[in-house]
UniProtKB/Swiss-Prot annotation:
This is Large ribosomal subunit protein uL16. It comes from Streptococcus mutans serotype c (strain ATCC 700610 / UA159). GO terms for cellular component: cytosolic large ribosomal subunit. Keywords: Ribonucleoprotein, Ribosomal protein, RNA-binding, rRNA-binding, tRNA-binding. The keyword Repeat does not apply. InterPro entries: Ribosomal_uL16, Ribosomal_uL16_bact-type, Ribosomal_uL16_CS, Ribosomal_uL16_dom, Ribosomal_uL16_sf. GO terms for molecular function: rRNA binding; structural constituent of ribosome; tRNA binding. Binds 23S rRNA and is also seen to make contacts with the A and possibly P site tRNAs. The keyword Flavoprotein does not apply. PROSITE patterns: RIBOSOMAL_L16_1 (PS00586), RIBOSOMAL_L16_2 (PS00701). Belongs to the universal ribosomal protein uL16 family. GO terms for biological process: translation. SUPFAM superfamilies: Ribosomal protein L16p/L10e.
Length: 137
């Protein structure tokens, strides 16, 4: 599971998810990629579930790059606790993903296999996605 080794602040502000991703909008390492078309928080568990779905379909062939990292903590109060009395305890880790960001990349597999593997991975994620190919240099 992806988690930061150490953080400066345990509890973070939620922040805004406006606009497009600044960088990481092109396929950089692999041949095919999975690009977000909407913005959302993606948890470390969702990233792991997507990774497992891809690698199992590819039968551990090919190469996978995970281009997002859950560096932001999110908090939650216990069920039945009244409002007030401070911010809740850290609950987990999320990667804020804006539209346009390439989240996963795949190489060394045929296009049909890559397309299906990324389709399976997209079902594990809370964002709408599209399959993209590396542009020829």
């Amino acid at each position: 599971m992806l988690v930061p080794k150490r953080v400066k602040h345990r509890r973070e502000f939620r922040g805004k998810m406006r606009g497009e991703a600044k960088g990481g909008k092109e396929v950089a390492f692999g041949e095919y990629g999975l690009q977000a078309t909407t913005s959302h928080w993606i948890t470390n568990r969702q990233i792991e579930a997507a990774r497992i779905a891809m690698t199992r379909y590819m039968k551990r062939g090919g190469k996978v790059w995970i281009k997002i990292f859950p560096h932001k903590s999110y908090t939650a109060k216990a069920i039945g606790v009244r409002m007030g009395s401070g911010k809740g305890a850290p609950e987990g880790w999320v990667a804020p993903v804006k539209r346009g960001k390439i989240m996963f990349e795949i190489a060394d597999v045929p296009e049909e296999v890559a397309r299906e593997a990324l389709r399976l991975a997209s079902h594990k994620l809370p964002v709408k996605t599209k399959f993209v190919k590396r542009e020829a240099e």
